[in-house]
Amino acid sequence: MKSLIIGGAGFVGAYLVRHLKNDLGQDVVVTKMPRKQVKVDGVDMNSIQVCDLDILQKESIVALFREIRPDYIYHLAAQSSVSVSWKNPALTVDVNVKGGVNILEALRELEDKPRVLFIGSGEEYGHILPGETPIKEGNVPRPGNIYAATKVCQNMLAKIYADAYGLDVMMVRAFNHIGPNQLPLFVVADFCKQVAEIEAGNREPVMKVGNLSAKRDFTDVRDVVRAYALLMKSGCAGETYNIGSGHAIAIEDILKCILDHSSVEIRVEVDPERLRPVDVPIIEADTTKVYEATGWKPEISLEQTIRETLDYWRTKSI
């Protein structure tokens, strides 16, 4: 089997490459933006085909699909930061909505149509009403930020194309996924990086934090990519699947876990610059549907992921 990973140069893409290549023995092709590098620890990069691709150029997508002729396509390319979406909404809409439509339109032009997985986010559900958690796929999305709104739009478009044109397209709503090598744009990586820098003496023993009361559903990225691969085998076209742990935890509890693993005393300060204009109070997944389709459930504990992420940033701070 041959898998094409669109946007494989990022955090999740690297883990997906490793899983598909090393664990499943698939042929893997990765796309990246021009001038961006792809390096996956533990994978012989000579065995991976890497191609430049701008998903805002539809004809380039069509040409690549016809050249590669993949069996499976994982669409990971996205502007995936909520904070960046507030600062640059136009870019977020272009990449997440226009880019998604370009891929769907390119699929329509192919004679041999591959199976495709569009990656969305638990942020799509937005403002959850009392009694709606854990969140099922049938919950009405009420996106609370620009990033989430673009992913809702992408999900709806993918569903319409699957139904109208018979495309073998599935969608996931992946809740917060974390692990070593994640950019510090995201909360766990940010906290771990700050702690590691403090331990190394590279900054004052003060942590800057945002909203600590928000509750989120965290899953190790290695479990997440395993779910993606299982859905390629067993998921149903036109369907959306939640990927998460099924348990929400307050950000303040995440912070406590990280600080418990630290070797120094650290003071915590709320930084107004880190507070979002709107923040969803709780996001927690119901993962019954993906379990029934694939048998998937997370295997790596949150404590293990946090410990390994902190150790990763310690090596970067030496």
Question: Where are the model-predicted features located?
Answer:
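N-terminal Rossmann NAD(P)H-binding glycine-rich loop of SDR-like oxidoreductase domains
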Residues: S3-D23
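Glycine-rich Rossmann NAD(P)(H)-binding loop
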Residues: I6, K87, N176-Q182, P205-R216, ...
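Conserved C-terminal active-site "lid" loop/helix of NAD(P)H-dependent oxidoreductases
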Residues: V43, V221, T240, E273-K297, ...
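NAD(P)H-binding glycine-rich loop region in Rossmannoid oxidoreductase-like domains
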Residues: I55-V95
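Catalytic helix-loop patch of NAD(P)-dependent Rossmann-fold dehydrogenases
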Residues: K87-E105, R115, E123-M171
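NAD(P)-dependent short-chain dehydrogenase/reductase
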Residues: I128-P134, M156-D217, V221-L230, G246-A248, ...
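Mid/C-terminal beta-alpha module of Rossmann-like enzyme folds, strongest
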Residues: F191, S234-L275
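Amphipathic terminal alpha-helices
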Residues: L302-I318
